[in-house]
Amino acid sequence: KTNPEVLYSQAHKALLNQDFDNSIKMYEALTARYPFAPESRQARLDLIYAYYRGREAESAIDAADTFIRENPTHPRIDYAWYIKGLVDFARTPNSLERLFNVDLSERPPTTARKSFAAFRTVVEQFPKSDYAHDSRRRMVYLRNRLASYELSVARYYIKREAYVAAAQR
């Protein structure tokens, strides 16, 4: 039987060694066995990052949402918002789309909107955060991506002579 300090230390070491699968298992075990231990709250925050780096996007989003909901006054809540934004940002164009120069303006920007919203939360609610500057930079990129999509949709409507729909874009 391990205590929460030892389990957290092992999980954190695995995370630092980029062994995301093992760190995820240990962080999950820690939060399940010792939900009220002081290490558990930090483990939940680290788990968001481990899911993100372990390419478990949905788990990362769920963990971030849960952390934000359960810890609204935590001093590092900006980090949870930032990682949440990064998860959706990473899904915005994937490497194959970049390689083959896929026109992103023709793809629905659902994840781009979610990412923009998370980064905006960091910038607006935590302007002095370590993550605010990077969030602002990513917002500029996402704003341009969203604008390109809207222009693409407007062009489509113009081709179809649906001028009212185009004007609404």
Give the positions of each predicted feature.
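Acidic, polar-rich low-complexity tracts and alpha-helical solenoid repeat scaffolds
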Residues: 1-169
